[in-house]
Design a protein with these regions (language model features):
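Peripheral, non-catalytic segments flanking oxidoreductase cores
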Residues: 1-174
Length: 174
């Protein structure tokens, strides 16, 4: 368990956080982050919007099926994905940051994943709460990435060319 707020509690606490982060990522491979500042009301609104989305009629969800998105965004029905050949028994919606489609044929293939999301017409609050979630969590991720770089002996902005200022993220609501 790592407390991100330790970065704000002085040089010694920040150094200890970075060392704990390095150990967790190097020796364990995962960690649970606390002290991130995500408001409980935002978590609640996100969970409520997710429940409301999955309670929509099938036709409403299929109207934004990810097969209609060149960026693989939108709804995936139960059994619509497989892992190692086995059906994944879940439904989900995938969203990313709202950005223009990259049309440059010389751009790397991964840039084709940038673009618009598909949103359900009958649940507009899903878009606003996920945009708020994305904005907040992207900032937390960039802060954590800077601490991780420092934990490895690099400058805090070592990963910035790859991830900042606008990280390419994917939110999967399951």
């Amino acid at each position: 368990v790592l407390n991100l707020a330790e970065l704000d509690r002085g040089p010694e606490a920040a150094a200890q956080f970075r060392e704990s982060l390095r150990a967790a990522t190097h020796d364990v491979g995962f960690f649970y982050l606390t002290g991130h500042g995500v408001p409980a009301d935002l978590e609640g609104r996100l969970l409520a919007a997710a429940r409301a989305f999955f309670a929509l009629p099938e036709a409403s969800k299929l109207a934004i099926e990810n097969t209609k998105s060149a960026q693989f965004r939108g709804y995936t029905r139960v059994g619509g994905e497989r892992t190692q050949g086995e059906i994944d028994w879940r439904e989900q919606i995938d969203v990313g940051p709202e950005r223009p489609v990259i049309t440059d044929p010389a751009a790397a293939d991964f840039w084709r994943l940038e673009g618009p999301n598909l949103w359900p017409e009958d649940l507009p609050e899903l878009q606003s709460v996920l945009a708020e979630w994305h904005e907040l969590l992207s900032g937390i991720a960039l802060r954590l990435l800077g601490a991780w770089a420092e934990s490895l002996g690099a400058p805090a902005d070592a990963f910035a060319p790859a991830f900042a200022p606008d990280p390419s993220t994917l939110i999967k609501v399951v």
